[in-house]
Design a protein with these regions (language model features):
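Acidic/aromatic-lined carbohydrate-recognition and catalytic surfaces
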Residues: 58-129, 133-164, 177-429
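Intrinsically disordered, low-complexity segments enriched in serine/proline and basic residues
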Residues: 2-3
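Structured C-terminal cap/extension of enzyme domains
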Residues: 674-727
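Alpha-amylase-like alpha-glycosidases and glucanotransferases acting on alpha-linked glucans and related
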Residues: 110, 244-393, 419-666, 670-671, ...
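Beta-strand-rich extracellular modules
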Residues: 165-169
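Short helix/loop capping segments that flank catalytic or ligand/cofactor-binding pockets
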Residues: 39, 186-187, 207, 421-422, ...
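Basic helix-extension-helix modules of the SAP/HeH family
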Residues: 10-63
Length: 727
């Protein structure tokens, strides 16, 4: 499509009158929640091309693409404006408890209609019609009228239904979700503050690990942290990964967020292991010993080797007989998982047989022609992968039980990834939920001047509404099933996401807006029912109203000391931090604090060719930031002396965040033991840096095992500091 840029920075079709095209594009984009421009990192307004808009609108289900004319756009706009008039009820209504909610009902003009609410417990009642006149519209040659009804303000929280019965016998139903106005929990309503620990579970190993931290290690780590006074343990996402090599190392690129990664299973902790025949146990012990020996020789975590050994061990245990009680538990788990669990397990079995997650076309989606036949042929492997999910859930549930039993107020804090792999089971099972031909990413900023493409397909806002937001509900329920809190990575994704058309650069995307009121409502409903705290990762450029909105809904934000600035780039004073937040010195995308003090991050970025400025300029900026931070630490009595040691600076930073009013304070385990290597170097792949494969080490590069933590001097000192100052 031939295009030119007009003076407003908006792309227009040069074959049509510019003003007409701008108006039509803006109207249809606005009507579908697609941004026609955005403010960049530098405060400049950037227009979005017509090509991008048309591709994105097409991905949203409209009959548009790059070749569309102004006439096509106008026809699509007509369809958009008539969409809600073509159905009796909206697909989903999300209403805050106590607030009431008015909704439209469309019927043949002049026809009567009755609308009932049906609660999840079966109780029923009628919705009242509101005296509000809206002129009828002609739809496909028929005059359609609109009536307005009201959701009673006193309906209880829950997943309910609306049922409309129209004169003539037509019946239509919709999902009705009554959600909390704000998350109400004792911890949030008290003046008490608590602290906890952030750890990458895969990197935190013990003498009993199979080369990677697991659920049994998690229980032990929680006990260690609780004994030191911590009230929560934040871990990386434990979502499902692919079942064959090469495994994806990033926990933030799972194949499904509904299901768990069986690599975190400890085979010996499965109940049936104890009753295995001696020969079977010897097979498992040999697999374990070989994996441990390899892990002790290598500097990095090898997920492929660990999973290959665990899979073989799990197959031995899976084949063992189970007691009636245990089999009954497994059967109930599979029944609750339903078709979603069955499809996930079948996807695993197919990928295992094909040796790749890029399945052939006749198996490329759950509705593909050969899939049901393969479900029968691969039934035993399907059973195995369903069993793995049961075992993983059981072991993670035990870790949360241990965390609470040893005194943690919150326990395990789960982490929820922003998206999934484009060839993963989540998209394979429900492709209609995702926008075709799109990837999620980020626009250019000061750190990534070409933008970012995360290679994750976005949920379609319309498809989510049509599904009653059940995929979101199930995802949140899964995250909270074995946790007392959830951190939502890039919580702005509940408001808007940067969509990039396939084949385009990350700079050629645009924002697509979601119904944040509905999505946050679903999250809060599930969190309220689970009694769980919700933390939103709201770093970066965020409109102030978004943070205000999250605060009003009872969601805690995230404050990182290096990102909290005031005039002149100076560190924000601790008393000015948000109280409704999790305050941190370090996060997984930053180097360990000791590594930053030593300049390791800048050296690495220079060696990898990632710096856009010369290294001395960057080092000068690092020195200035550390000098300003040091001055603040002195000012607030967080460090003493003119030349504090590296360890004193690290502890001083934690004294600083402990002085904030933030409800939660988190210490990174890497800081507690003096690690220096980054877990993740944003903007790099496995060819440049071993992201998400670095085991927990001390400042000399020696691995620190969980057994070492109770007596680790540096950790004990830092945790005692937090125990005494965060109340």
């Amino acid at each position: 499509m031939s295009s030119a840029r007009n003076v407003e920075g908006f792309f227009v079709d040069i074959h049509a009158p510019a003003s007409d095209n701008i108006d039509e594009l803006r109207r249809i984009a606005d009507a579908n929640g697609v941004a026609t421009g955005f403010w960049d990192w530098y405060g400049n307004w950037v227009g979005v091309s017509a090509s991008t808009l048309l591709k994105v609108l097409g991905a949203l289900g409209l009959p548009l693409d790059e070749s569309s004319t102004v006439g096509d756009v106008r026809e699509a706009l007509r369809l958009t404006e008539e969409r809600e008039w073509r159905r009796t009820l909206p697909p989903t209504i999300v209403a805050r408890q106590g607030g009431g909610y008015m909704f439209p009902v469309h019927v043949p003009d002049g026809s009567w209609v009755n609308v009932q609410w049906v609660l999840e417990d079966g109780r029923k009642g009628s919705c009242d019609q509101v005296d509000r006149y809206v002129a009828p519209r002609m739809i496909d040659g028929e005059l359609v009228g609109r009536a307005t009804f009201d959701v009673p303000h006193w309906l209880p929280l829950g997943w309910h239904r609306l049922v409309a019965t129209v004169e003539g016998g037509h019946v239509e139903s919709a999902t009705l979700i009554i959600v909390p106005n704000t998350l109400s929990l004792p911890l949030l309503e008290s003046s008490r503050r608590v602290w906890g620990v952030n750890a990458q579970l895969y990197s935190t190993r013990s003498a009993s690990s199979w080369g990677i931290g697991d659920a049994t290690d998690l229980a032990d780590l929680a006990a260690v942290c609780a004994d030191k006074g911590a009230d929560f343990l934040l871990i990386n996402p434990v979502h499902a990964s692919q079942p064959v090599s090469p495994l994806e190392n990033s926990p933030y690129l799972p194949v499904s967020r509904r299901w768990l990664n069986p690599i975190y299973i400890r085979p010996e902790s499965i109940e049936e292991y104890a009753s295995l025949p001696q020969a079977s146990r010897e097979v498992i012990e040999q697999l374990r010993d070989e994996t441990r020996q390899f892990a002790t020789r290598e500097d990095l975590i090898d997920r492929d080797r660990s999973w290959e050994a665990k899979r073989k061990a799990l197959e031995v245990i899976f084949a063992a007989p189970r007691s009636y009680h245990r089999q009954s538990q497994l059967d109930r788990f599979i029944e609750r998982g339903g078709s979603e669990l069955s499809n996930y397990a079948l996807w695993c079995a197919l990928v295992e047989r094909e040796g790749t997650i890029e399945l052939p076309e006749d198996l490329a989606r759950s509705s593909a022609p050969r899939v049901e036949l393969e479900r029968l042929e691969l039934a035993e492997r399907v059973d195995f992968y369903q069993w793995c999910q049961w075992v993983a859930a059981e072991q993670l549930e035990h870790a949360q039980h241990v965390a609470r039993e040893v005194g943690m107020e919150i326990g395990i804090m789960a982490d929820l990834a922003v998206g999934v792999h484009g060839y993963g089971s989540e998209k394979w099972s429900r492709p209609e939920l995702f926008a075709s031909g799109m990837s999620v990413g980020a626009p250019p900023d000061v750190y990534s001047q070409q933008g970012q493409n995360w290679s994750q397909p976005p949920w379609s806002p319309r498809s989510l509404a049509e599904s009653g937001y059940l995929p979101l509900r199930d995802m949140v329920r899964a995250a909270l099933a074995n946790a007392g809190a959830v951190r939502i990575d890039h919580i702005l994704g509940m408001f808007r996401l940067w969509w990039i058309p396939d084949g385009c650069a990350a700079t050629e995307g645009t924002y697509v807006y979601y119904d944040h009121e509905a999505m946050m409502g679903v999250i809060l409903l599930e969190a309220q029912r689970a009694g769980a705290v919700v933390i939103g990762e709201d770093l970066g450029v965020v409109e102030p109203w978004v943070r205000d909105y999250l605060r009003d809904r009872g969601v805690l934000g995230t404050s990182v000391v290096w990102f909290e600035k005031e005039g002149g780039g100076w560190p924000l004073r601790p008393e000015h931090y948000r109280d409704r937040a999790l305050a941190a010195v370090n996060i997984h995308d930053l180097p360990p604090t000791l590594g930053y003090i030593r300049g390791i991050q800048t050296t690495l970025r220079s060696e990898l060719g990632l710096l856009t400025d010369d290294i001395e300029t960057v080092r000068a900026g690092d020195r200035l930031e550390l000098e300003q931070m040091g001055a603040r630490l002195h000012e607030y009595g967080c460090i003493d002396g003119a030349e504090p040691s590296e360890r004193e600076i690290v502890e001083g930073l934690y004294r600083y965040v402990a002085k904030t009013p933030s409800k939660l304070v988190v210490a990174s385990l890497v800081d507690a033991v003096g690690d220096v290597r980054p877990q993740n170097m944003p903007g790099t792949g496995a060819d440049l840096y071993p992201n998400w494969c670095v085991p927990l080490c001390d400042s000399d590069g020696e691995e620190v095992a969980i057994e070492d933590l109770p007596t680790d001097e540096r950790l004990t000192s830092l945790f005692a500091l937090l125990r005494g100052s965060v109340r």
